[in-house]
Amino acid sequence: MKPHTDEPLTGGSRAKTRKGSLSRKGVRRCGIVAVALSAAVLLSSCMPQGAVTEKRADQLSVGDAVIAVRLSEGKFSAGLPDPPEDNWIVLLDAQGRGQATRIEAKRYGISTLLWTERGLSFGVPDKEYVTTDQGTQEIDVKQPSISEYQRFLLPDGRIAVVALGEGIRVDTIHPHGRIETTEIPDTRGEIGQCGQHIVGITDTEDSESIRSAAFEAYAAQSGGDMPENVAAVIQIDEPNGDVPRLLAVAPAIDGLLTGRMSVPCDGNVITVLSIQQEDPAAVRNGTRQPFDGVLVLQRWDLTTGQRTIIPVLDEAGQPIETDQDNFLYYSRAIRVGDEYRFVTKKGNAYAVDVTSGNARHLFSIPSEKTRNPAVFQVSETGVYVLEQNDDEDVLTLSYQPWDGGGKRVLLTTGTMSRYLVERNLLMGYRRSIESFALRPGWDGGAQ
């Protein structure tokens, strides 16, 4: 472990309130046929571009914002110069008005947003920001990080920012702005949160750092033949030196791919949706794709150290097959009662009983035809979808309850069009939605 502590800046930067004047020149002419929409629909696609005010990152404040959006780097257009390598953070209120700031992009992974009661958390390689009603706290990161995997809110108010590369790095942001960095070399795996700790699932082939300790722990646990590869649940936020703590071990299963750990553990039991490859040998020699297989649940009991594999079956009792176009590494999931509910990157929603593995297909979210896929967030009641309409450069936020009832539009806005698309004689590019977060307690009338 390579720990160091970053001291906070003295005080947070207070954001200044600036109201942009709206002139007729800024108003975009657009013809919209009035339709009968519910009171929850907040339409602002004809609002002027001046409704979004640009500020420095340290001048942002939450204000009346209900949604925060992080836009990716621009996508290259043939024959034109390379697009800028930066991101935009845009905060919008329910009418599509708000603030925007240009920030440096992280090169690898997906740069996420985390909006908690403490404020909106986001970062760049050398700084972390926490934006509240009072302004933005800017915190220097002494060892810059060019990648990001996920942000987690810990029970005591700390925020953990995880980055993956040749090893695993965790930047823990304390409530008063101090950053504590932990780096574990030669370690890879799928990372998630279990209570107050950050944990991962890996094996001795992917993580050389645990090899000796994992085989020793398995020998003490089983007393039988030693497998060639040992799988393990590890704790990465409080390692033993350069080695993560081992929480459980079991023989590694050939071709078992651990899915994204987006569901918190239930007590001492971790349940992760995973893929069992149909033919691992064919994958290794290149004749099959890595995601050709079937869905399973991987359950680890940290009290006993035991792992159980549960097949996931559809309503007809058949395995659910996966392939390159229908896999779960970009799924969003949540635990609701005894069910693991998730939505795939293509908008297919399922519920899986965590004990039996019986699955139900809940719905498929109708999506606009677009070059940029929709981005999802989940709650205990349903799925929030943020989509980008390529033809009109409009963003639409909608909601689909888990128990049915149809897709409901919550907000439509064109005020971000100049940040989504750049068209001129010298440059042309399009940005996509990298991530978004909703203000805690705001549902847009979805419930």
Language model features: what each stretch is:
Residues 2-3, 31-170, 428-447:
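N-terminal "mature head" segments of proteins
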Residues 53-58, 104-117, 144-156, 184-196, ...:
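Repeated scaffold domains used in trafficking and secretory/extracellular systems
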Residues 3-6, 10-11:
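Cleavable N-terminal export/targeting peptides
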Residues 59-82, 112-125, 150-164, 190-223, ...:
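Short beta-strand elements that form the blades of beta-propeller/WD-repeat-like
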Residues 16-37:
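N-terminal export and membrane-targeting signals
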Residues 48, 79-108, 124-146, 163-186, ...:
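Surface-exposed loop/turn elements that mediate protein-protein interactions on large endomembrane-trafficking
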Residues 372-396:
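C-terminal hydrophobic structural anchor segments
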